[in-house]
Amino acid sequence: MCSCLVVKNTVIGSGRTKIAVPLVARDAAELSAVLEQIKNMPFDIAEFRADFLECAGSIGEILHHTQTVRDALPDKPLLFTFRRHGEGGSFPCSDDYYFKLLDALIESRLPDIIDIELFSGETAVRRAVANAQKNGIAALLCNHEFHRTPPQEEIVCRLKQMEDCGADICKIAVMPQSAEDVLTLLSATLKAKELAAKPIVTMSMGQTGAVSRLAGQVFGSSITFGSGTQNSAPGQIGVSALRATLDCLENGAD
């Protein structure tokens, strides 16, 4: 039975699927514009995608921009994500830099949730998870497959591996090559929901997989990602359209 996670009065893992909006910007001016544009959008969680910054190689600059986001959205749960190139992100970096950055963000206590890539070395991942939780930050462990959809059993196994590493939220995103692949992801989500003790987040990417972003409440995915001003992953739906569709599915259409 999945237990929920409460972050700034937002309940993750129970009730309606929560909408996260990625904040994508190259510099301070773009970030300011993005924050202005999304402030009245119907989202639940802000995800700061720091890997898109031109200054992504500077921990100090990233901390500065994260503070800007925190100040602009004081009441929204803030998910900090630094997606590396190998998992579909914009910045290639070493494990050493990656974990130094995560440590700095954790110790700043600016984010409420921090994204940690599962396949970054088990010892380092477990240490980062423990450090986050010690500082009152929820650890979201994640994995991304940009070229295929693994079998159902493998998807469930990876989500279980995240939970075994201490994750507060377990996330996997896969790329479908067919409609059957989308069904595989949804079936895996349903199975993982039955087994998991922590909230799970799943999605099938691209246009073919877009339906998975709308079906979380039925199959068990706790968060869906919708674009605010710019997509951060293939197949994201605009936040306003996403909210309207989720409302329609939840309340029923006449």
From Swiss-Prot:
<comment type="similarity">
    <text>Belongs to the type-I 3-dehydroquinase family.</text>
</comment>
<keyword id="KW-0057">Aromatic amino acid biosynthesis</keyword>
<dbReference type="InterPro" id="IPR013785">
    <property type="entry name" value="Aldolase_TIM"/>
</dbReference>
<comment type="pathway">
    <text>Metabolic intermediate biosynthesis; chorismate biosynthesis; chorismate from D-erythrose 4-phosphate and phosphoenolpyruvate: step 3/7.</text>
</comment>
<comment type="subunit">
    <text>Homodimer.</text>
</comment>
<dbReference type="InterPro" id="IPR001381">
    <property type="entry name" value="DHquinase_I"/>
</dbReference>
<comment type="function">
    <text>Involved in the third step of the chorismate pathway, which leads to the biosynthesis of aromatic amino acids. Catalyzes the cis-dehydration of 3-dehydroquinate (DHQ) and introduces the first double bond of the aromatic ring to yield 3-dehydroshikimate.</text>
</comment>
<feature type="active site" description="Schiff-base intermediate with substrate">
    <location>
        <position position="171"/>
    </location>
</feature>
<feature type="binding site">
    <location>
        <position position="232"/>
    </location>
    <ligand>
        <name>3-dehydroquinate</name>
    </ligand>
</feature>
<dbReference type="GO" id="GO:0008652">
    <property type="term" value="P:amino acid biosynthetic process"/>
</dbReference>
<dbReference type="InterPro" id="IPR050146">
    <property type="entry name" value="Type-I_3-dehydroquinase"/>
</dbReference>
<feature type="binding site">
    <location>
        <position position="83"/>
    </location>
    <ligand>
        <name>3-dehydroquinate</name>
    </ligand>
</feature>
<dbReference type="Pfam" id="PF01487">
    <property type="entry name" value="DHquinase_I"/>
</dbReference>
<feature type="active site" description="Proton donor/acceptor">
    <location>
        <position position="144"/>
    </location>
</feature>
<keyword id="KW-0028">Amino-acid biosynthesis</keyword>
<feature type="binding site">
    <location>
        <begin position="47"/>
        <end position="49"/>
    </location>
    <ligand>
        <name>3-dehydroquinate</name>
    </ligand>
</feature>
<feature type="binding site">
    <location>
        <position position="236"/>
    </location>
    <ligand>
        <name>3-dehydroquinate</name>
    </ligand>
</feature>
<keyword id="KW-0456">Lyase</keyword>
<dbReference type="GO" id="GO:0003855">
    <property type="term" value="F:3-dehydroquinate dehydratase activity"/>
</dbReference>
<feature type="binding site">
    <location>
        <position position="213"/>
    </location>
    <ligand>
        <name>3-dehydroquinate</name>
    </ligand>
</feature>
<protein>
    <recommendedName>
        <fullName>3-dehydroquinate dehydratase</fullName>
        <ecNumber>4.2.1.10</ecNumber>
    </recommendedName>
</protein>
<dbReference type="GO" id="GO:0009423">
    <property type="term" value="P:chorismate biosynthetic process"/>
</dbReference>
<dbReference type="GO" id="GO:0009073">
    <property type="term" value="P:aromatic amino acid family biosynthetic process"/>
</dbReference>
<dbReference type="GO" id="GO:0046279">
    <property type="term" value="P:3,4-dihydroxybenzoate biosynthetic process"/>
</dbReference>
<keyword id="KW-0704">Schiff base</keyword>
